[in-house]
Swiss-Prot record:
GO terms for cellular component: small ribosomal subunit. The lineage of its organism: Bacteria, Bacillati, Mycoplasmatota, Mollicutes, Mycoplasmataceae. With S4 and S12 plays an important role in translational accuracy. Located at the back of the 30S subunit body where it stabilizes the conformation of the head with respect to the body. It comes from the Bacteria. Keywords: Ribonucleoprotein, Ribosomal protein, RNA-binding, rRNA-binding. It comes from Mycoplasma mycoides subsp. mycoides SC (strain CCUG 32753 / NCTC 10114 / PG1). Residues 48-111 form the S5 DRBM domain. HAMAP family: Ribosomal_uS5_B. InterPro entries: Ribosomal_Su5_D2-typ_SF, Ribosomal_uS5, Ribosomal_uS5_bac-type, Ribosomal_uS5_C, Ribosomal_uS5_N, Ribosomal_uS5_N_CS, Ribsml_uS5_D2-typ_fold_subgr. This is Small ribosomal subunit protein uS5. GO terms for molecular function: rRNA binding; structural constituent of ribosome. Residues 1-45 are annotated as: Disordered. Part of the 30S ribosomal subunit. Contacts proteins S4 and S8.
Length: 254
């Protein structure tokens, strides 16, 4: 009997321990934070690089006194033709930069590239800011200064000339570069807008090639054709001589 009682007690203790463990697991599951897989938009946004252009202190004057805050201007890009700019204000610098990055990722602009440079020359304007952008050869590098350099680098352009012709305000310069880069178009796009259809640039032969082909055809003409042309010229000259002699004889007879 004593052995049976001991077995019953041990089994009851085991059951109670199992119940306690199950309740603990349930409680921990309630407070566990669910981790969801990252969306594609977050994964794409992580590819962007950031550059802080300016950080300045701003003040707001009220009846109670002056309130100081920090304003940051940040440029974001993936170096593959996507660039964005954003501004942010906060009581501390890191918070202002975070706000600016968040706004820049919402205001992305696509830029048309031609290998490592831009397709053509363009003048971007915004307010009093003006910037001239020109294409350059491979190996030239980025010849630009100020806020425009950050925009050009993060856009993926590595060979370009840029010159500021207007205001030196950072925001105006950045917006002027955005206006200039976004207005650029490739040759195919211009042809589509003008004629409503695309052309294969490979099929269109340059003028020099056409001239060379024409010269080659002239050289390859057979000798018989040249002889026929010479005979026709001689016959025409004889006919002219006969007409002239007939006219002279008629005038003498009169």
């Amino acid at each position: 009997m004593t052995e049976e009682m001991n077995v019953v007690e041990t089994s009851s203790e085991m059951n109670s321990n199992v119940e306690k463990a199950s309740t603990q697991v349930k409680e921990t599951k309630k407070f566990e934070r669910r981790t969801r897989p990252q969306s594609k938009s977050k994964q794409v946004k992580d590819e962007f690089e950031e550059k802080v252009v300016t950080i300045r202190r701003v003040t707001k004057v009220t009846k109670g006194g002056r309130h100081f805050r920090f304003a940051a201007v940040v440029v974001v890009g993936n170096k593959k033709g996507l660039v964005g700019m954003g501004t942010g204000k906060a009581n501390e610098v890191p918070e202002a930069i975070k706000k600016a990055i968040k706004e820049a990722k919402k205001n992305l602009v696509s830029v048309t590239l031609r290998n490592t440079t831009v397709p053509h020359e363009v003048l971007g304007t915004f307010g009093a800011g003006k910037i001239l952008i020109k294409p350059a050869k491979v190996g030239t590098g980025i010849i630009a200064g100020g806020p425009a350099r950050a925009v050009i680098e993060l856009a993926g352009i590595s060979d370009v000339y840029a010159k500021s012709l207007g205001s030196n305000n950072a925001i105006n310069m950045i917006r002027a570069t955005f206006e200039g880069l976004s207005s650029m178009q490739t040759l195919k796009r211009v042809q589509e807008l003008r004629y409503g259809k695309t052309f294969d640039t490979q099929k269109v032969k340059p003028v020099e090639q056409k001239v060379a082909e024409v010269k080659g055809v002239e050289k390859k003409q057979p000798k018989q054709a040249v002889k026929k042309v010479a005979v026709k010229k001689a016959e025409n000259q004889e006919n002219r001589v006969e007409v002239i002699t007939n006219a002279e004889t008629e005038s003498k007879a009169e």
